[in-house]
């Protein structure tokens, strides 16, 4: 910010506008005008000596003509130099003004970018620490674990291929049969339970024995998964009502 204040100060602009033209004038004066004047005088000295030897009576007019020529040359050179200096000064001031405006705009854009970045980082930190986002993340992790559990029970490596209705139906059958494996085998032998259903039921029964969880709870987990994916069908609702003791309506 110190550089920006310096560039905006009137003293800095005055020094640039006055100091640079004066330095340029002195540079041109000592490097161009004075050496050129000395060369003209040196070249004219032998000519004056010759003319004095040939025409002694005309010495004074020759000197006057030479002085006039030298004065005209110097005046013309000064006019050219001053004209060039004015042109360069205008160009220099224009360039300084343009550069100053560009630098000012660049600094403003940089400040805006830094402010936007700071706000973005702050907003990102606020979102990541939001209790609402934490709850959503925990729910997603919980649903993911439930899907994994159900997938393992039905013997599928792809959770998307799990038939939740079929899984809940198997849990209902276990609850109705009070986890009696013999009764379930009799249903299988009579053809009321398919081999796929029997396979799933036996896996669920083994899982329940090892994890101390009920078939009703597993059915509720599967129903929650279906609800999370907006796939809670009327048939699933019917099976849940049976588990809750509400019977079957319609």
UniProtKB/Swiss-Prot annotation:
Disordered: region residues: 42-72
Keywords: Archaeal flagellum, Archaeal flagellum biogenesis, Cell membrane, Membrane, Transmembrane, Transmembrane helix
GO CC annotation: archaeal-type flagellum; plasma membrane
Keyword Transmembrane: yes
Keyword DNA damage in annotation: no
Localization terms from the record: Archaeal flagellum; Cell membrane
Record's bilayer topology term: Single-pass membrane protein
Activity regulation comment: The presence of the flagellar core components FlaH, FlaI and FlaJ seems to be crucial for the stability of FlaX.
Induction, per UniProt: Part of the fla operon, which encodes the seven fla genes essential for crenarchaeal flagellum assembly and function. Expression is induced by tryptone starvation.
Ranges of the Extracellular topological domain: 1-9
Ranges in the topological domain labelled Cytoplasmic: 31-250
Pfam family, one: ArlX
Disruption phenotype: The deletion mutant lacks flagella and is non-motile.
Biased segments, Basic and acidic residues type: 62-72
Membrane-crossing residue ranges in chain numbering: 10-30
Positions with biased composition (Polar residues): 42-61
Free-text comment about domains: The C terminal region is involved in the oligomerization, but is also essential for interaction with FlaH and FlaI.
Role noted for this protein: Component of the archaellum. FlaX, FlaH and FlaI form the core cytoplasmic motor complex of the crenarchaeal archaellum. FlaX forms a ring that may act as a membrane-bound cytoplasmic scaffold that guides the assembly of the archaellum motor complex. Is essential for archaellum assembly.
Quaternary structure and interacting proteins, as annotated: The S.acidocaldarius archaellum assembly machinery and its filament consist of seven proteins (FlaB, FlaF, FlaG, FlaH, FlaI, FlaJ and FlaX). FlaX assembles into ring-shaped oligomers. Interacts directly with FlaH and the motor ATPase FlaI.
Protein name: Archaeal flagellar motor scaffold protein FlaX
Organism taxonomic ancestry: Archaea, Thermoproteota, Thermoprotei, Sulfolobales, Sulfolobaceae
